[in-house]
Amino acid sequence: MIDFDDVAAINPELLQLLPLHPKDNLPLQENVTIQKQKRRSVNSKIPAPKESLRTRSTRMSTVSELRVTAQENDMEVELPAAANTRKQFSVPPTHPRPSCPAVAEIPSRMVSEEVEEQVHSIRGSSSANPVNSVRRKSCIVKEVEKMKNKREEKKAQNSEMRMKRAQEYDSSFPNWEFARMIKEFRATLECHPLTMTDPIEEHRICVCVRKRPLNKQELAKKEIDVISIPSKCLLLVHEPKLKVDLTKYLENQAFCFDFAFDETASNEVVYRFTARPLVQTIFEGGKATCFAYGQTGSGKTHTMGGDLSGKAQNASKGIYAMASRDVFLLKNQPCYRKLGLEVYVTFFEIYNGKLFDLLNKKAKLRVLEDGKQQVQVVGLQEHLVNSADDVIKMIDMGSACRTSGQTFANSNSSRSHACFQILLRAKGRMHGKFSLVDLAGNERGADTSSADRQTRMEGAEINKSLLALKECIRALGQNKAHTPFRESKLTQVLRDSFIGENSRTCMIATISPGISSCEYTLNTLRYADRVKELSPHSGPSGEQLIQMETEEMEACSNGALIPGNLSKEEEELSSQMSSFNEAMTQIRELEERAVEELKEIIQQGPDWLELSEMTEQPDYDLETFVNKAEFALAQQAKHFSALRDVIKALRLAMQLEEQASRQISSKKRPQ
């Protein structure tokens, strides 16, 4: 056994810490060579032990035990540390044998080689694991490596998830990423749709929204549904958006109404919660109005008139027919039978600011106000009906005559407001009136500006009447003393529906679910939401009402841009839209004046005919003939001069309208 105390006593310099030499910082291979030479010079002074003689197997077992112990102590191989390690170890032989008398002592060279082998084994083991022995990692480096590994794992997981999602959705499918995001969002919703068993709440102003399913054209284009209705009064619009870096995301906008009908709701369900509560009102001597409002092609005519199959319509499944059936059911009840009520119906349309009777070969009607400030529709025929079947026949007759045309969004769009009225009369006097209005499809002015003049005039008149309708509903909801019903022919005709304490109104906003109609859908919902938030149930503050009053125009009704916080290009477009609307108003006024002057000229026709007949008599008075001719010419000259001036002004207004339309088309914002 080696006694290191004796070794230290003989060589005290071994216990001294040697300063590091600059060469110790050399690379590992060169450093090992230098240290090996130093150890040889130092270890050569160690004497051999005198107690016992060890064989080669004993030396090998000692070296192996030293190697294992060095690994357990992290093998920090520094020269002073190695010396301390050698000092602490006392390794007994594995197989002790008696000392051999033939050998007196072990040469010092053998001991030196043995120690050298032990140190070299420790050096070798430390060089085999240089990370732990030479450079130990700090905590910061370890944390950075952990974060890097987690990041790589997260990237791999995301890549795997994207691959799985891509397999679920066809990558060639347009907007498939938006479809996936909408599907994931809907998975988090708890849906409780409206059912026939839900209670009906009565409102003076009831605003509902109805979503139609995707039609054949939208399915052929592989459009996605961006509308969700999770509950009976809540609607969500998943508006697709793009960030600056072209990252796609959804902006989910929520709207709350009295009732919200999804694509599975039938006309019967819609009627039960919208128009049916209003039938009782007209039997109580009131006025009721039900509007269907929305983008062209969103399902207004289907809701009001019934199922459509091409141009044919099943009127028995529309709100018109359902309301008439309930009217006759209530009329036959004992409490109302004694009143002796008679049921009359009228059906007319308002097209481009003019009224036409759909039940009288589209005869043109005139709207006048009598001395009692009551609006009268001159020439409108009222038809007596005795059953719901008679009403359906009238509806079929009038619907076949209604004006329609091709627009940006619908090839067979209703371009007029159709008003079907159910009148209750008791002994010739008006007892109650129910007006069911299928409004024309609203479109933005920027979309109709590139069409022909007739389409532009249609769109301008439609938007003007819708804006006036909103103002009248606002006055009704706030119980204002003044109702601005003179702003359009539509509100003039429905004036008595907006005044009086016993007046009730219901609006059904119909929307399209396709992604291409998202902007139009938002415009419709904002219009309907404005009507609802102005009702007494929501109770806006006075500051909000003042802000609503000062707004110049609703984006959802006419599509014009609201001044303020706009770019220079948008301000120019807004100014041009204002000029376009002014030109349209001027054209409409001049047109009416020209028609009046022409009628005056035609009325002078009998005078000329009388003069012609006078000349056929053999003894007519020439003096009388000349006097009458001069008088007729003077009258005709006055009317012709007035007509000529009106026609010139009309031509100028048409040129201004054409110029404004071209400017709008050239600067129209990209969609």
Curated annotation (Swiss-Prot):
List localization entries. Answer: Cytoplasm, Cytoskeleton; Nucleus; Chromosome, Centromere; Chromosome, Centromere, Kinetochore
The record's section on Gene3D superfamilies has:
Kinesin motor domain (3.40.850.10)
Q: Pfam families under this entry?
A: Kinesin
What GO molecular function terms would the record report? Answer: ATP binding; microtubule motor activity; microtubule plus-end binding
Q: What is an annotated GO biological process for this record, any one? A: metaphase chromosome alignment
PTM comment: the record says: Phosphorylation by AURKB, regulates association with centromeres and kinetochores and the microtubule depolymerization activity.
Q: Please tell me where this protein is predominantly located.
A: cytoplasm
- Tell me which UniProt keywords the record has, alphabetically: ATP-binding, Cell cycle, Cell division, Centromere, Chromosome, Chromosome partition, Coiled coil, Cytoplasm, Cytoskeleton, Disulfide bond, Kinetochore, Microtubule, Mitosis, Nucleotide-binding, Nucleus, Phosphoprotein, Ubl conjugation
Which superkingdom?
A: Eukaryota
UniProt short sequence motif Microtubule tip localization signal, positions renumbered to this chain: 44-47
**Region Globular, annotated ranges:** 1-200
Q: Where does ATP bind?
A: 294-301
Q: Which residues form a coiled coil?
A: 564-604
Assigned GO CC terms: cytoplasm; kinetochore; microtubule plus-end; nucleus
Q: List the disulfide bonds in this chain.
A: 191-233, 290-506
UniProt domain Kinesin motor: residue ranges: 204-534
Would the keyword Coiled coil turn up in this protein's UniProt record? Answer: yes
Q: Where is this region: Disordered?
A: 36-62
* Assigned protein family: Belongs to the TRAFAC class myosin-kinesin ATPase superfamily. Kinesin family. MCAK/KIF2 subfamily.
Q: What is known of its domains?
A: The microtubule tip localization signal (MtLS) motif; mediates interaction with MAPRE1 and targeting to the growing microtubule plus ends.
Function of the molecule: In complex with KIF18B, constitutes the major microtubule plus-end depolymerizing activity in mitotic cells. Regulates the turnover of microtubules at the kinetochore and functions in chromosome segregation during mitosis. Plays a role in chromosome congression and is required for the lateral to end-on conversion of the chromosome-microtubule attachment.
Q: What is this protein called?
A: Kinesin-like protein KIF2C
What's the source species for this entry?
Macaca fascicularis
Kindly list the organism's lineage: Eukaryota, Metazoa, Chordata, Craniata, Vertebrata
